[in-house]
Regions:
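Short, Lys/Arg-rich N-terminal segment immediately upstream of the first membrane anchor
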Residues: 23-27, 228-231
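Transmembrane alpha-helices
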Residues: 1-26
Length: 315
């Protein structure tokens, strides 16, 4: 499929270019942008715009898509107990997940940048390694970490093995509210810290040594140099990394579905959408929740693209 796709695109552009070459120069300049950008816009419209419009249309109808109900599904999306719980949990994911991922990424990148090059490479490889694991795969790994067995039984879960080894009682970590949501967030922090570390590390290496030395000569200690020179200098990168992780946490689904199925107070927006559409078979409500999630993601995505564009222009 890759060969056919790439080959087809090359053939399309080659033939289109041959056709455009037959026109006068003035027409060439007008037609070339449409020739090269047009197919991409058409594909995006077919696979993105049309499904969005169909989803919005479906959100205005009842569960079976037969009776027009107007904004009733949206009222449910903003007032039902399940959705209010989902909004609360998504906000927790957004604040804690993003804060810890970027914070740990910045900390590790800063410490590794000061270490021996060989040690730096090894540490970065180990921290980045979880990024190669799928969300479901990571969930399976962490299920063994949080595994619970009744008191007296052999604890195969790492966390409970440590707790019982220290004389404590085993806990059903994924059932304890509201801490279970934080235990799920820990999985994404484990996954996203590597991404944040790599991007921030590249930005740190771009900080001019002369700037750091000037700060030290002026009497600034290392903490002052870091917070008053380094952090402001890489602010754009920190914002870009943060918004990228925010997008990820807003759409979080795999971890929650794999670990708890949204039960025990861990429901999130994307999982509630899945529940309504594929368990309750209420396509109207599911579509409305999908639209709400899309509206929540668009401003962050737009801001992220603006930041990326500014950084590109700076170079």
């Amino acid at each position: 499929s890759i060969i056919w796709g790439v080959g087809g695109a090359l053939a399309l552009f080659f033939v289109a270019n041959m056709v455009v070459e037959q026109f006068p120069d003035d027409w060439k300049k007008r037609l070339l942008p449409f020739i090269f950008v047009g197919p991409a816009i058409a594909i995006l419209a077919w696979y993105l715009l049309i499904p969005v419009l169909r989803t919005f249309y479906a959100s205005l109808f009842d569960a079976k898509g037969e009776v027009f109900v107007g904004l009733e599904n949206y009222i449910y999306a903003f007032t039902s107990k399940a959705m209010l719980e989902s909004f609360r949990n998504n906000l927790l994911w957004l604040i804690v997940g993003t804060g810890l991922s970027v914070g740990f990424g910045l900390l590790i990148a800063t410490l590794a940048d000061r270490a021996d090059p060989v040690f730096e490479t090894v540490v970065k490889a180990l921290i980045f390694m979880p990024m190669a694991i799928s969300m479901v795969g990571a969930s399976v790994i962490w299920k063994f970490v949080y595994e619970f067995r009744p008191p007296g039984a052999e604890q195969i879960g790492l966390l409970n093995a440590i707790v019982t080894g220290l004389g404590g009682k085993p806990q059903a970590w994924l059932l304890v509210q509201p801490w279970n949501t934080l235990f799920l967030i820990a999985i994404v922090v484990w996954l996203q810290t590597g991404y944040a570390m790599v991007i921030i590390s590249a930005a740190l290496k771009g900080v001019p040594a002369e700037l750091l030395e000037a700060g030290r000569i002026d009497g600034a200690n290392e903490l002052q140099v870091f917070f008053k020179i380094v952090v402001p200098y890489i602010r754009g990168t920190l914002v870009t990394v943060s918004t990228t992780v925010i997008l990820f946490t807003l759409k979080i689904f795999d971890v929650v579905q794999s670990m708890t199925g949204g039960n025990f107070g861990t429901q999130v927006i994307a999982n509630e959408q899945y529940t309504q559409m594929f368990r309750a078979f209420n396509y109207g409500r599911g579509s409305a929740i999908a639209v709400v999630l899309l509206i929540a993601v668009i401003p962050v995505m737009y801001y992220n693209l603006r930041q990326f564009s500014r950084q590109t222009e700076a170079f």
